[in-house]
A protein has these predicted regions:
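Generic enzyme active-site microenvironment
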Residues: 39, 87, 116
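Conserved core of the sugar-phosphate nucleotidyltransferase
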Residues: 94-167
Length: 167
């Protein structure tokens, strides 16, 4: 862990609540959220269950983020009442309720909504990794950092993850 703790970032506490709990509390403020799924690492099974989250489905993650997301999406495919999905990194609880509302609102007419931040830092690309002196400065005009939560049409994101998991 980057911040020198044996406890995963999602389980760190702020004002007595884990980052997972903070995210769940925020999500529950929106009536459009019909189901909350927490994907956890196998080694964190006891820790996530100790949170005693009510009305939350726990799903064991996979060997990488893509597989973990796919495991969660599989739980939703038989739910006829769910056509859209929000995917969020539980280690990032500082999204605003205004952003959350905007994502939900924009999903009424979009296939996907992915919040982005313009890159301010200098961006470089190594052209030949065997000779690191060949570094090319990149224009930032078309480069962005993406954030979560991200929203997608369930069928489309499920199919993408399904096809990627087969590779």
């Amino acid at each position: 862990h980057r911040f020198k703790s044996n406890i995963g970032k999602s389980y760190q506490k702020i004002a007595g609540k884990s980052l997972i709990e903070i995210n769940v509390i925020k999500a529950r403020k929106f009536k459009q959220i019909k189901k909350i799924i927490i994907v956890y690492n196998k080694k964190d099974a006891k820790r996530v269950k100790s949170l005693k989250l009510k009305h939350v489905q726990l799903v064991m993650g996979g060997k990488n983020r893509q597989q973990s997301t796919y495991n969660a999406l599989k739980c939703l495919t038989n739910k006829k009442s769910i056509s859209k999905v929000l995917i969020h990194d539980s280690a990032r609880p500082n999204f605003s309720l205004k952003l959350f509302h905007s994502i939900i609102k924009n999903m009424k007419s979009a296939r996907a909504v992915v919040p982005k931040i313009k890159i301010q830092d200098a961006v470089k690309q190594i052209i030949d990794s065997s000779k690191e002196e060949y570094i090319l400065g990149k224009k930032r005009d078309n480069l962005f950092l993406t954030q979560t939560p991200q929203a997608f049409k369930l069928k489309e994101i499920y199919q993408l993850h399904k096809s990627n998991s087969a590779k």
